[in-house]
Regions:
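Glyoxalase I/VOC metalloenzyme domain signal
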Residues: 1-9, 13-33, 43-250
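Fe(II)/2-oxoglutarate oxygenase catalytic core
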Residues: 38-41
């Protein structure tokens, strides 16, 4: 399956217990869309008005983490749901979802109502989170996976260094690490590559400042580690199944 991807639209986490993951993510200082309506989403201010920027939590078996790629034209399954804001205003969301692809789990999406993921009360977070900047994956052969995705998405590919490939279609980056490079880069949280590869393992979230986030995590008894560049790292166990790298912008 080949597409002309505009950007990585969102990260989709299919979990056995999404509400447990939502609770952990709230302890990290994220706002989520209202409980009781699937999916629960962590939404951010997007770079483009018609390309949302978010993470979604879905209930399902087996658990899988997949990338959603935004396209302008797509035929597929139409999914609709409605959330209610705190002031009682109903927000309707409609998304057309295409077939799954590989070698990393991914699928194409076309938004009927992109504004639904940009409500002001959902894109402001107590931890100062601003945007989903990057997604991290691990593969035995990063170059081969990057090459396959370049062809599938009409993407640009760059070798950052030996053991790390960058795949880019828009604003949000995909970094594909070798197991050794990933474990070395994120050794502060004792990161371990999954057994089944390739796999998506984490995200980079832009935040305003590091110190308020650190104070919030300490107050909520959430373990974290610090890395070069004032980055704040939380392990998958603390953050709903994915490693989170918080990158301060100030």
């Amino acid at each position: 399956m080949k597409i002309s991807a505009r950007d990585i639209d969102h990260l989709s986490l299919t979990l056995t217990e999404p509400e447990a993951a939502a609770t952990r993510l709230q302890q990290l200082g994220f706002n989520l869309t209202p409980e009781g309506v699937e999916p629960r989403c962590i939404c951010f201010q997007p770079d483009q008005d018609d390309v949302p920027n978010y993470v979604e939590l879905l209930q399902g078996e087996p658990p899988v983490t997949a990338l959603a790629l935004n396209v302008t034209e797509l035929e597929g399954e139409e999914r609709t749901h409605a959330w209610e804001t705190e002031d009682g205003f109903e927000v309707d969301a409609g998304v057309v979802v295409g077939e799954s692809g590989g070698p990393l789990p991914w699928f194409a999406v076309r938004h009927e109502t992109p504004d639904a993921f940009m409500e002001p009360e959902w894109i402001v977070h107590p931890n100062g989170a601003l945007a989903l900047m990057a997604v991290h994956a691990v593969a035995e052969k990063p170059k081969e996976v990057a090459k396959a995705l370049k062809e599938a998405w009409s993407a640009k590919v760059e070798e950052v260094f030996d053991g790390c490939m960058l795949v880019k279609t828009g604003t949000v980056e995909l970094l594909i690490w070798s197991p050794d490079a990933y474990q070395s880069e994120y050794k502060a949280i004792e990161a371990m590559a999954p057994q089944d590869l390739p796999a998506i393992v984490g995200v980079t979230i832009a935040i305003e400042r590091a110190r308020p986030l650190q104070a919030l995590l300490r107050a909520n008894n959430v373990p974290f580690a610090l890395a070069e560049g004032d980055r704040v790292l939380t392990s998958p166990e603390q953050s709903g199944g994915v490693m989170i790298e918080f990158l301060p912008q100030n």
